[in-house]
C-alpha cells in the first residue's frame, strides 16, 4: 500500500441465504452470492480432475448435482464455523480479491446473536485472517442508518429469519426485539406446495430455485386478501404466465398473493406465531410508552422478503388497525432495502467519527475475544 493511500474497510453482511460483501464508501455490494458450502457426495472418480474438497457460493450452486449443500447460517445465526470460515475465505480471496490482513473488516450479526458467537467471529477474524481491525454491527441497526434515521423500528426479513427491532438514538432495545422463524425460504416452500396443488410439481433443489424466481418476479401482497381471492375466482385479470427453463409456460393466479400472505397469517403454513404486523405491534408495545410515537412514525422495512409489491401499504393498514386511533403511522420501504444492511455498514465504516470504534488487533491481543462486548453494542 502506498503511504498516503486511504485503506478502505471491507463490509461483509452474512445472511442466511446470501452473502453481501464489498468496500466501505461504495453504494452497493460488489459481491452477492449464496451462503452455501457444497462438498462432493462421492470420492473423486476422475483422477487428475482436480476435484476440490469444497465449493462455495455460485460454484456450489452450479455443481449441486454432485454435491451435498449446506447453509452454515441458519435463521440468521452461524451454526457451522468450519463452513463459515470457508465462506469468509471465498469472500476475501475469490470475490473481493483482497488480502484481509490489509483492511479493517465490518461484519454484521443477527439481533440477539449469542455472546459466544460474537466472540468466535472476532477470534476467527483476528487469528485466521489476521485483520488489522474489526467491528460487529447489528443488521437492523445498519438498515435504519441506511434510511437516514437513528430512531425507529426495523422489520428485517431475509431468507432465514425475520426480526422486529426497535432502535432508539442508535441503540437497539434488546428486551423488545422479537424473532419470527418465518422468512423467504418458507415462502418459497409454500409456493412450491400451492403450485403442486395446481398440478405443477416442483420437488428437487434445482426446481426450488425456479420457484424462488417465480416468487421474486410475480408475487405481491394483497391489500385486502378476501377481496383479492374473489377477483381471482371471478376473472383471469390476476393471471400471469412464466416460462420455465425448458420452454414450458405455466400460468399462476391467486398463488401470486397467497404466497406472501403467509407473512401476515402464518397459520396458512401451520405456524402458531403472530404475523409480521402483529409482531411489529407487539415489539412496539414492549417499549417505553414515551417512545412509541417515534416508533409508529418510523417503521422501516428491510431485507429481501420485504421486496413484495404492496407490502408497505398492507403493513400500514394492519398497524393502523392495531394502534391507537390518533396515532400517526408511517411505513418506510426504501427501494434499495434488499441491500440496506450492507449499505448501512458501508456508511458506518466510512464515517470519520467511527474510526475510533474499531477493535484494533492490539486491543484483541491484550483482552481476547471478549473485547467485542465492550466495543460493539
Swiss-Prot record:
Keywords, ordered alphabetically: ATP-binding, Cytoplasm, Cytoskeleton, Hydrolase, Nucleotide-binding
Domain of life: Eukaryota
Pfam families on file: Actin (PF00022)
Lineage, broadest ranks: Eukaryota, Viridiplantae, Streptophyta, Coleochaetophyceae, Coleochaetales
Subcellular location: Cytoplasm, Cytoskeleton
GO molecular function: ATP binding; hydrolase activity
Keyword Hydrolase among UniProt keywords: yes
Source species of the chain: Coleochaete scutata
UniProt xrefs under CDD domains: ASKHA_NBD_actin
Function: Actins are highly conserved proteins that are involved in various types of cell motility and are ubiquitously expressed in all eukaryotic cells.
Enzyme Commission (EC) number: 3.6.4.-
Family classification: Belongs to the actin family.
Protein name (database record): Actin
Catalytic activity, reaction form: ATP + H2O = ADP + phosphate + H(+)
Cellular component, GO annotation: cytoplasm; cytoskeleton
Amino acid at each position: 500500500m502506498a503511504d498516503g493511500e486511504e485503506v478502505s474497510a471491507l463490509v461483509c453482511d452474512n445472511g442466511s441465504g446470501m452473502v453481501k460483501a464489498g468496500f466501505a464508501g461504495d453504494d452497493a455490494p460488489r459481491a452477492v452470492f449464496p451462503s452455501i458450502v457444497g462438498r462432493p457426495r462421492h470420492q473423486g472418480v476422475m483422477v487428475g480432475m482436480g476435484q476440490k474438497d469444497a465449493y462455495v457460493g455460485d460454484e456450489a450452486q452450479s455443481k449441486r448435482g454432485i454435491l451435498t449443500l449446506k447453509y452454515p447460517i441458519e435463521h440468521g445465526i452461524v451454526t457451522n464455523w468450519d463452513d463459515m470460515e470457508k465462506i469468509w475465505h471465498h469472500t476475501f480471496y475469490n470475490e473481493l480479491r483482497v488480502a484481509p490482513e490489509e483492511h479493517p473488516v465490518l461484519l454484521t450479526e443477527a439481533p440477539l446473536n449469542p455472546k459466544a458467537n460474537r466472540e468466535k467471529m472476532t477470534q476467527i477474524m483476528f487469528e485466521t485472517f489476521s485483520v488489522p481491525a474489526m467491528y460487529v454491527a447489528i443488521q437492523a441497526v445498519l438498515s435504519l442508518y441506511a434510511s437516514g434515521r437513528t430512531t425507529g423500528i426495523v422489520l428485517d426479513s431475509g431468507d432465514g429469519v425475520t426480526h422486529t427491532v426497535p432502535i432508539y438514538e442508535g441503540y437497539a432495545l434488546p428486551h423488545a426485539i422479537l424473532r419470527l422463524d418465518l422468512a423467504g425460504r418458507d415462502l418459497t416452500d409454500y409456493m412450491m406446495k400451492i403450485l403442486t396443488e395446481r398440478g405443477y410439481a416442483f420437488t428437487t433443489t434445482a426446481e426450488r430455485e425456479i420457484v424462488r424466481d417465480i416468487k421474486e418476479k410475480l408475487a405481491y401482497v394483497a391489500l385486502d386478501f378476501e377481496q383479492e381471492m374473489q377477483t381471482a375466482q371471478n376473472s383471469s385479470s390476476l393471471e400471469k404466465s412464466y416460462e420455465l427453463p425448458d420452454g414450458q409456460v405455466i400460468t399462476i393466479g391467486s398463488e401470486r398473493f397467497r404466497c406472501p400472505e403467509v407473512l401476515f397469517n402464518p397459520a396458512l403454513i401451520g405456524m402458531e406465531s403472530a404475523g409480521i404486523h402483529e409482531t411489529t405491534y407487539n415489539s412496539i408495545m414492549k417499549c417505553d410508552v414515551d417512545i412509541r410515537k417515534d416508533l409508529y412514525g418510523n417503521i422501516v422495512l428491510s431485507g429481501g422478503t420485504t421486496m413484495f409489491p404492496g407490502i408497505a401499504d398492507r403493513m400500514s393498514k394492519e398497524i393502523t388497525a392495531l394502534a391507537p386511533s390518533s396515532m400517526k403511522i408511517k411505513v418506510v420501504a426504501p427501494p434499495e432495502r434488499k441491500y440496506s444492511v450492507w449499505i448501512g455498514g458501508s456508511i458506518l465504516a466510512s464515517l470519520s467519527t467511527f474510526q475510533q470504534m474499531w477493535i484494533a488487533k492490539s486491543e484483541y491481543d491484550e483482552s481476547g475475544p471478549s473485547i467485542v462486548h465492550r466495543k460493539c453494542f
